Amino acid sequence: MSQVYFDVEADGQPIGRVVFKLYNDIVPKTAENFRALCTGEKGFGYAGSPFHRVIPDFMLQGGDFTAGNGTGGKSIYGGKFPDENFKKHHDRPGLLSMANAGPNTNGSQFFITTVPCPWLDGKHVVFGEVVDGYDIVKKVESLGSPSGATKARIVVAKSGEL
């Protein structure tokens, strides 16, 4: 299974690294999209993009590297791609799942759960999990608000594959 990372900053100050394990065996197309966006090997990706929506006791959302506000992003496959499967459930904190605008609208936006979110099962594709740096996820979570607005500009300063 691939491992990738984000080096996260808040208002330009480094706060730490989050490492993810991707479920290549269960959702290979979804995992490959995220891996390639972490490396930037296609000429675009997550480096420099914000966590634009952070809701405490729910999730951290990012991955819009085109508009930076939740309206953009794109996949390595060109635009959106279909939901691969819903074999994994949102049953614990630290899961990596695709954000979308309805069925079969996966691009580059993702979220990291901070609680179990069973109401998202069958609607969002879980494709990985945090294996190191969950304390950094919690730091980012503390900078969010019920509306999703963040108290600092939280950015993926650097990302890549381990």
UniProtKB/Swiss-Prot annotation:
Pfam families: Pro_isomerase (PF00160). It catalyses: [protein]-peptidylproline (omega=180) = [protein]-peptidylproline (omega=0). One of its GO terms (molecular function) is peptidyl-prolyl cis-trans isomerase activity. The modification Phosphoserine is found at residues 142, 145. Residues 5-161 form the PPIase cyclophilin-type domain. The modification N-acetylserine is found at residue 2. Binds cyclosporin A (CsA). CsA mediates some of its effects via an inhibitory action on PPIase. There is a cross-link at residues 29, 42, 123, 139, 151, 158 (Glycyl lysine isopeptide (Lys-Gly) (interchain with G-Cter in ubiquitin)). It is an enzyme of class 5 (isomerase). GO terms for biological process: ascospore formation; cellular response to starvation; DNA damage response; negative regulation of meiotic nuclear division; positive regulation of meiotic nuclear division; protein folding; protein transport. Its EC number is 5.2.1.8. It comes from the Eukaryota. SUPFAM superfamilies: Cyclophilin-like (SSF50891). It is found in: Cytoplasm; Nucleus; Mitochondrion intermembrane space. PPIases accelerate the folding of proteins. It catalyzes the cis-trans isomerization of proline imidic peptide bonds in oligopeptides. Involved in histone deacetylase complexes, suggesting a function in chromatin. Imports fructose-1,6-bisphosphatase (FBPase) into the intermediate vacuole import and degradation (Vid) vesicles. Regulates the meiotic gene program via the Set3C histone deacetylase complex to promote efficient sporulation, and the prolyl-isomerase activity is required for this function. Present with 86000 molecules/cell in log phase SD medium. Belongs to the cyclophilin-type PPIase family. PPIase A subfamily. PANTHER family: PEPTIDYL-PROLYL CIS-TRANS ISOMERASE, PEPTIDYL-PROLYL CIS-TRANS ISOMERASE D-RELATED. This is Peptidyl-prolyl cis-trans isomerase. It comes from Saccharomyces cerevisiae (strain ATCC 204508 / S288c). The gene is CPR1.
